[in-house]
A protein has these predicted regions:
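Membrane-proximal intracellular helices of multi-pass ion channels
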Residues: 1-482
């Protein structure tokens, strides 16, 4: 275990977080907030700089990162970044409990959007900005950002990126890893900027436009007002956000291929096709189920499209309380919570690509059982599926079910409502945000017990980091020096 290298990378990350916190500090000056808020951010920035410099002042002699170091770096980085990111909420006493503040910040960085704040109107502008800004930072990955900003990287940095970028497979877009990170972030930030402009054209000010754009880009769902998107009462805003969420749920590699002229290759992506088919099917099924309850078909279609877009991309914005929709519609949405959007996007969930692969593996197994001597080839993207990938997908599903079961058992001990317990785990583990029952769009996670919040925070981190980085922290072999 190269502990010096782990400390060095984490030190760089803490310095990066200090840089990022300058933005909410600036917001506190712009809106003339009291010294309490300016002091909170300034104090945390100084603490981060001190710790960051202490850990990364001198480069380690051995700069190599192996697989386990990559997992440990990713897991510890996200935990520490969330812990320090929670401090402004605690210091300003807007979220007095550290467990609550940690839950809120983990929810932000993991782009989950589950909240313990029942009333956003009492939260300062600087804290609202930081809360939503964590979505933008966590969406593409905090360590991907480190690789993009600090070009010097070790030969094993690919292990870090593999552990943080969502999906069953990973590939570099260009020859250098740091260049790949910069390409991804450029596309990501330009698209976010376009979202801000489009929302401002809809009559929103720069502050609310930025917060909603951050929530859309990171597919996180934190907003600026109580009631999520409903208070805006704007068809234009609804459509911009609904389309935006779908766009950010697409693999960012596809946008890169479009930019370099490989449009046909990009649009023939198998996962993209299934993603759009699933969205269309879900909208149609729910429309058939609830359209009669709306006075306007257009309004019904708008709410349904927005909700499906929000749930499948695990964003969590809402224009309607889908907790009051018929059971069939809620069941469709619950399935979408598990599917998630595309690999290589900012969305959570299992990812469409994994669901496709698992379905093909299941069908192949059935065919093999019917005709034992038959050779069944499983293809994905017109190529035979590698045995290593198949094993990885199967293992992921097994571990996913195991963690989900443990989280459900723990949370169910603290509530007498199974729907609330099940959807709370599904909503946090899949990085969605609101669930059903007492954690639905009209409620918050404030009434959950501290034990539940701690376990759900673990679930959010595990879901965002593809399970294994969080689990490897508990393996004794991880910490042995070889």
């Amino acid at each position: 275990m190269n502990k010096r290298m782990i400390g060095f990378v984490i030190g760089r990350l803490l310095l990066l977080e200090a840089m990022l916190m300058v933005l909410p500090l600036g917001v506190s000056f712009i809106y003339g907030e009291s010294l309490k808020y300016k002091g909170a951010y300034f104090g945390v920035i100084m603490l981060l700089i001190a710790m960051g410099l202490a850990l990364s002042f001198k480069s380690p002699e051995n700069m190599s990162i192996q697989g386990r170091e990559g997992f440990v770096i990713v897991a510890l980085s996200w935990i520490l970044m969330s812990a320090f990111g929670a401090l402004p909420f605690v210091i300003t006493k807007e979220i007095p409990s550290f467990i609550d503040a940690f839950f809120e910040t983990v929810s932000g960085f993991t782009t989950t959007g589950s909240s313990i704040i029942p009333d956003l109107s009492v939260i300062s502008r600087s804290n609202l900005f930081w809360r939503s800004f964590t979505h933008l930072v966590g969406g593409m990955g905090v360590l991907v950002l480190v690789l993009a900003i600090f070009p010097k990287h070790s030969p094993g940095s690919v292990h870090v990126m593999k552990a943080e970028v969502p999906g069953p497979t990973f590939g570099k877009l260009v020859s250098k890893l740091s260049a790949t990170a910069r390409v991804l972030y450029k596309i990501y930030l330009v698209m976010t900027g376009i979202m801000i402009v489009l929302l401002m054209l809809g009559g929103l000010d720069w502050f609310e436009s930025s917060l909603l754009a951050f929530g859309t880009a990171g597919t996180g769902g934190f907003g600026a007002r109580n009631g999520s998107i409903l208070p805006y009462n704007s068809a234009y805003v609804d459509i911009v956000l609904a389309v935006g969420m779908l766009v950010f749920g697409v693999n960012f590699n596809i946008y890169y291929f479009i930019l370099i002229g490989k449009v046909k290759e990009a649009l023939s992506n198998e996962e993209l096709k299934y993603y759009l088919i699933i969205v269309g099917a879900a909208v149609a099924l729910i429309f058939i189920n609830i359209s009669a309850t709306y006075k306007s078909m257009g309004h019904a279609l708008r709410d349904i499209f927005f909700t499906v877009s929000s749930v499948i991309t695990t964003t969590g914005f809402s224009t309607a309380d889908f907790g009051k929709w018929p059971v069939f519609s809620q069941t469709v949405l619950l399935l979408l919570m598990f599917f998630g959007a595309c690999a290589g996007s900012t969305a959570g969930g299992l990812k469409i690509s994994r669901v496709i692969m698992m379905a093909k593996m299941f069908v192949a197994e059935i065919k093999q059982m019917i005709s034992p001597n038959r050779v069944v080839s499983i293809k994905y993207e017109h190529k035979p599926l590698d045995s290593k990938v198949k094993k990885g997908v199967a293992n992921y599903f097994i571990v996913y079910i195991g963690i989900f079961t443990v989280l459900l058992l723990v949370v169910s001990m603290t509530t007498d409502d199974f729907l609330t317990a099940f959807s709370a785990v599904a909503a946090t583990f899949n990085n969605i945000g609101p669930g059903l029952g007492k954690v639905g769009p009209a409620f918050s996670f404030a009434d959950m017990t501290d034990v539940s919040k701690i376990f759900l925070s673990f679930g959010m981190l595990a879901g965002r980091l593809e399970l294994f980085p969080m689990l490897i922290l508990f393996a004794p072999e991880t910490w042995k020096i070889k």
